[in-house]
Amino acid sequence: MGFLTNEKLLIVGAGGAIGSNMAQTALMLGLTPNICLYDIIEPAVHGVAEEMYHCAFPGANVTWTTDPKEAFTGAKFIISSGGAPRKDGMTREDLLKGNCQIAAQFGDYIKEYCPDVNHVVVIFNPADVTALTALIHSGLKPNQLTSLAALDSTRLQEQLAKACGVPQYKVTDCYTYGGHGEQMAVFASKAKVDGKPLSEYNISEERWAEIKHDTIQGGSNIIKLRGRSSFQSPAYQAVKMIEGAMGGTPFTWPAGCYVDCDKCGFKNVMMAMPTTIDATGVHFTEPQGTEAEMADLRKSYEHLCKMREEIIALGIVPPVEDWKKDNVNL
């Protein structure tokens, strides 16, 4: 079996549903034979490793560990789904604080054990701020760390396809930018359906409102239908992001990236932008949209700034002016 690279891929949180799906997807796509599965829960990660062995992927060299030093040392590519899910009785602040503390430790492990890592993808929520926290603590350059944001755009693509009665792949140029959550900005003014402008389909204001709602609530709908949060789609898209970073097919769905751009008017946040991930890292361009779309993006950015200030107030990351003390690349 041919592989894209032989470099070590570390999957953090590998004992969970997302992590185990990432391991299998990476092997099925032939990204690398050398995959390390890491989790703090020994039986779960051990079980995932056994499943991968039973798949009998030719040439695969799958290892597992609960020791962070063993896991992170030598890793060149990392995907982390290692956050904690929201549980009954937890407030939003509980989730924010808990997962950002996990993200801070994750970043510290990178700085200590694998500072030469090529690319890192963070996918545990709230992804915009967990990724920002990890970046600050890791010491990495901004183009080396991204967060998962593509699902919002693929959900928009699905909703538009259903509304227009076409296969999903025939809907193009529809994206969501800004935050990963209810404050996301939906950009569809340049969308095309089977090569035709979306405007030719005369979607009513009421139907458009439904499309936006169903896009934003796409993750919640999965929970209602399946009784648990998404795991197959985030696993697949995260692995495709790493594939781009490994030098495979560039990843062109929006990704969360560090933005400090005077021209855009967005400063010191992680947010979804028009991006490409390739072997040189992640690169973003300025979003282009209608006045209303850009206004929604500004609102989303302002919400991200508030979340950033929350983790600063919690002491998880320092004030913006002190970030260079932890990461000279910011």
Enumerate the language-model features and the residues they cover.
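Generic hydrophobic/aromatic pocket-lining and core-packing "Φ" positions
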Residues: 23-24, 107
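Conserved S-adenosyl-L-methionine
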Residues: 28-34, 139-142
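Conserved N-terminal Rossmann-fold NAD(P) cofactor-binding segment
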Residues: 6, 31-75, 90, 309-312, ...
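Rossmann-like NAD(P)-binding element
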Residues: 55-119
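N-terminal Rossmann-fold NAD(P) dinucleotide-binding loop
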Residues: 19-20
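C-terminal substrate-binding/catalytic lobe of Rossmann-fold NAD(P)-dependent dehydrogenases
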Residues: 138-144, 153-330
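Rossmann-like NAD(P)(H) cofactor-binding subdomain of soluble oxidoreductases
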Residues: 91-159
